[in-house]
């Protein structure tokens, strides 16, 4: 039986170890990380894509598949996803200086989303780039590209709400680990290239979702 109370306590304790200052050099390699599922959720599939910055040329990628260890439990997603992410990370030869993770950083009820959890375990600077809001007050943005609001939980800033593309839902950006609030937004902006998602997580999302087009395009780019 899964002890959810113990897992939540572990999140609270690990959140105290999260560093929210910039501890990385100007990156020449940036990675995107995302997780998908196969066999009706029985298999967890993680993809990590390393890209040269600023060309966004793909350097390498790793896909890891493991038996799913936990069912979906709101707020405990990182315990479900991190084991597969760590397995994929172990196979990466060209380690990046910065990783964009599809999911939350500190914008989490206990301030430990998958980007923060993975960054702490792998000891790598991370940014959470989420497609939906998990916590904090939602705010309506103008439809203009670049419209930005702070993602707040009472008096605490958790991240940013950012319009990356017209007529698309905004992104919810938050620092994960060893990245400041300001840098989290700035680096996502630098990696937007005409799509809703920044290039690193756009590619990781496509590969982790098992889309054949992304697999083929990726082979062509290598």
Swiss-Prot record:
Belongs to the endonuclease V family. DNA repair enzyme involved in the repair of deaminated bases. Selectively cleaves double-stranded DNA at the second phosphodiester bond 3' to a deoxyinosine leaving behind the intact lesion on the nicked DNA. Its EC number is 3.1.21.7. PANTHER family: ENDONUCLEASE V (PTHR28511:SF1). This is Endonuclease V. It is found in: Cytoplasm. HAMAP family: Endonuclease_5.
């Amino acid at each position: 039986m899964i002890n959810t109370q113990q897992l939540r306590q572990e999140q609270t304790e690990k959140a105290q170890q999260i560093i929210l200052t910039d501890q990385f050099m100007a990156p020449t390699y940036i990675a995107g990380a995302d997780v998908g599922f196969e066999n009706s959720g029985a298999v967890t599939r993680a993809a990590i894509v390393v890209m040269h910055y600023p060309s966004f040329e793909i350097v390498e990628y790793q896909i890891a598949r493991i038996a799913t260890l936990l069912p979906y439990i709101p707020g405990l997603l990182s315990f479900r996803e991190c084991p597969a992410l760590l397995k994929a990370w172990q196979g990466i030869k060209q380690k990046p200086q910065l990783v964009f993770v599809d999911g939350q950083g500190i914008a989490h009820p206990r301030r430990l989303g998958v980007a923060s959890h993975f960054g702490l375990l792998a000891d790598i600077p991370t940014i959470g780039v989420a497609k939906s809001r998990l916590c904090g007050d939602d705010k309506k943005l103008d439809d203009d590209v670049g419209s930005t609001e702070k993602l707040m939980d009472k008096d605490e800033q958790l991240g940013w709400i950012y319009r990356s593309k017209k007529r698309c839902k905004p992104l919810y950006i938050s620092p994960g680990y060893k990245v400041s609030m300001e840098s989290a937004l700035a680096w996502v902006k630098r990696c937007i290239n005409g799509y809703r998602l920044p290039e690193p997580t756009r590619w990781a999302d496509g590969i982790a979702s098992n889309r054949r087009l992304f697999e083929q395009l990726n082979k062509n780019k290598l």
